[in-house]
Amino acid sequence: MTAILERREATSRWAQFCNWITSTENRLYIGWFGVIMIPCLLTATSVFIIAFIAAPPVDIDGIREPVSGSLLYGNNIISGAVIPTSNAIGLHFYPIWEAASLDEWLYNGGPYQLIVCHFLLGVACYMGREWELSFRLGMRPWIAVAYSAPVAAATAVFLIYPIGQGSFSDGMPLGISGTFNFMIVFQAEHNILMHPFHMLGVAGVFGGSLFSAMHGSLVTSSLIRETTENESANAGYKFGQEEETYNIVAAHGYFGRLIFQYASFNNSRSLHFFLAAWPVVGIWFTALGLSTMAFNLNGLNFNQSVVDSQGRVINTWADIINRANLGMEVMHERNAHNFPLDLASVEAPSVNA
């Protein structure tokens, strides 16, 4: 018998690198999307931490009145934020090398634009990386599809809305109180609470929380016991076991009797599709609503919809909300303009008797 030995071809460094990047045996999968994701998210995180701690005040409204957002300039964890890029910059691309000096870049809020751009690219690549790993493992692509909902929401808040409003200064500040300020101003200017797509998003988030709690409690309550009464039921589960770990028939029967038969799923695949789709579709609609309101296609307006036979207005809840909106609009950017647009564009009512 003759043995033929062939010399193995030397693998190039590039091929070795490609194999390492795309290997599913790594403790953390990198992937080609990860090559972009990792430096982007590291950059965004590093600059955010530094700016949150030490960034000097930013002239957010472009009127030479800087607003302090960092911890070293008098804020705490609640009030601190990375202040959005100045209204004087608008939508211009504003990297460090476009400013005359580092001090000017910081004064005009350059870190905000740097963080947002790297963050959005990073989370988009994270979504692509989810798809890439699923593809290499032979899985279906729906994990990445589900993650597209928060990616769409973040993109709407940090990119689409500033584009529609004409300035990055209208983006959401990167902080706790800054987030709430953004929400209040958004309600004042766009009446988001009366927008059907926002309502769908609320139903998606709260409904998803309810369904998640219901599903988790039902599964935990219908585990198939593999242990004695003296041991934890959890000890009877072995990772990767072929047998089912809970009795879906028992869970279905319980829930069907609690409400009614057809309110309960008897198909595990349909159930888990529903659990995924409900919040995802709701958040998709919210992101779409934010993106339309960015261009001032606002929530429904029912102000002064009800009048009596004499033509006098009978106030409804819509009128109460409108009064609150005007109050919030008066309070924000108080030095950037004399009157809110809603008040400045309407002729003052007569005060004659």
Curated annotation (Swiss-Prot):
GO terms for biological process: photosynthetic electron transport in photosystem II; response to herbicide. Chlorophyll a PD1 binds at H198. Fe cation binds at H215, H272. The record marks H190 as: Stabilizes free radical intermediate. The record marks Y161 as: Tyrosine radical intermediate. The record marks A344, S345 as: Cleavage. Belongs to the reaction center PufL/M/PsbA/D family. This is Photosystem II protein D1. It comes from Oltmannsiellopsis viridis. The lineage of its organism: Eukaryota, Viridiplantae, Chlorophyta, Ulvophyceae, Oltmannsiellopsidales. The gene is psbA.
